[in-house]
Amino acid sequence: TGRPFTGVPLELREFPGMRYALTANGARILDTATGEILIEHLLSKESAKKALEITGKYDTLQEIYFDGQGYAKDEKLAHVERYHKDCNMWEYVRASRIAVPDIWELFNSREENLDKVQALFADMEERKAAWEELSECRDLNLVSSLKYNIEINAAGVNKGKGLIALGK
């Protein structure tokens, strides 16, 4: 899944026989029974900063993910409907992200690398422009599960490679 582990419904996290969770598009793979991180391919702080600077030029709800948890600016999260076009997802997003007053303050206060960055766009032309600019960054891998978002991982990170690595 592209979700962080905390964003996976509890029923699935505790489902009998589901031993592993491939999260954040393959950036983090863990043993659900023990909580042990088996594989990590994290986004460097430098690359994440670049992604945040680019997406921050636009009207976006930016999310950063550390250690399986998503964080978003409180003011933007309060208006998730402006950025997330699927009303069925509004409560999920509000419930699964931790609201913070300043995304940059949190980013700068943490030393570790990130699972991923995500930006939800209010305007699709702005999304297109951001995608083009982000695509020029060779240290980033871009995916989109929705017409209005960009999920940003470290280069080479994706669910397929994560499954192959887990299989080894």
Regions found by a protein language model. Give the residues of each.
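Conserved acidic, metal-coordinating active-site core of Asp-based
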Residues: 54, 58, 65-168
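Active-site phosphate-binding/coordination module
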Residues: 2-85
